[in-house]
Swiss-Prot record:
The active site is at 130 (schiff-base intermediate with dna), 162. Its EC number is 3.2.2.-, 4.2.99.18. 8-oxoguanine binds at residues 27, 48, 59, 134, 160, 190, 194. Keywords: DNA damage, DNA excision, DNA repair, Hydrolase, Lyase. It catalyses: 2'-deoxyribonucleotide-(2'-deoxyribose 5'-phosphate)-2'-deoxyribonucleotide-DNA = a 3'-end 2'-deoxyribonucleotide-(2,3-dehydro-2,3-deoxyribose 5'-phosphate)-DNA + a 5'-end 5'-phospho-2'-deoxyribonucleoside-DNA + H(+). GO terms for molecular function: class I DNA-(apurinic or apyrimidinic site) endonuclease activity; oxidized base lesion DNA N-glycosylase activity. Contains two alpha-helical subdomains, with the 8-oxoguanine binding site located in a cleft at their interface. Contains a helix-hairpin-helix (HhH) structural motif and a Gly/Pro-rich sequence followed by a conserved Asp (HhH-GPD motif). The keyword Transmembrane helix does not apply. It comes from Nanoarchaeum equitans (strain Kin4-M). This is N-glycosylase/DNA lyase.
Length: 216
């Protein structure tokens, strides 16, 4: 018997995920309104955990208030204070590499798998860790906000496994399997699932996905 989520997601495509990302994801819309250097966006993504507010609101505030690395220090102290010492240490670890990424942003946009590995190495983490792969997603959003054309996410990069996705299935291998069966990269699957409860007047296939997720 076919997995019900796979059956529903087979009705979608990368183009559907692209539509959601460009038109409905408030994190991208915030960066589109106030584009930022990609290194600064990655730095914020690396500390985007244990937030005290919805992620959409956090990124909207970031886009409005942060224009430099020094701004980010002040911002995290005020708006992202949980585990503050750990987050400040993560910023310090990343800081020496921010210019390297900025100078090579086009290379990394063409080779997001390489950026995935580079971030994991410098942060001493696994390439599948949630903050690492989420940073890739936000890096791509930052590039699009700067005017670069859309590039699909690579199939090799994992989905950011947060509590909502863990309710469906906590095993990353399951999500790679879903990706393979639906021909949608994991980060684009995240885009289809993550904002689904905030979309009104849903087309039928989105409504089916929302109904399935609501009943879990």
């Amino acid at each position: 018997m076919e997995d019900p989520l796979i059956k529903i997601l087979k009705q979608f495509s990368i183009e559907d995920a692209k539509y959601v990302e460009y038109n409905l994801d408030r994190q991208f819309l915030a960066l589109k309104e106030n584009p930022k250097p990609v290194g600064l966006v990655i730095a914020n993504a690396l500390i985007s955990y244990q937030l005290t507010m919805p992620g959409e609101r956090y990124w909207e505030l970031f886009a409005k208030k942060v224009n430099s690395f020094n701004d980010l220090y002040d911002f995290v102290k005020k708006y992202n204070p949980r585990f503050l010492s750990n987050k400040l240490k993560r910023l310090e670890r990343f800081k020496p590499y921010i210019d390297i990424i900025e100078q090579n942003r086009e290379h990394y946009y063409e080779n997001m798998v390489a950026l995935n590995k580079f971030l994991a190495k410098i942060m001493n983490q696994n390439i599948y860790d949630k903050t690492i792969v989420f940073s890739i997603k936000m890096f791509a959003y930052a590039m699009r906000a700067l005017g670069y054309k859309f590039k699909p996410f690579p199939f090799e990069i994992a989905i950011p496994l947060d509590y909502r996705l863990k309710k469906i299935n906590p095993d990353l291998n399951y999500w790679f399997y879903v990706s393979k069966q639906t021909n949608i990269p994991p980060l684009h699957i995240d885009s289809l699932i993550w904002p689904i409860f905030r979309i009104k007047n849903l087309p039928k296939k989105f409504a089916l996905l929302k109904e399935y997720l609501s009943n879990l």
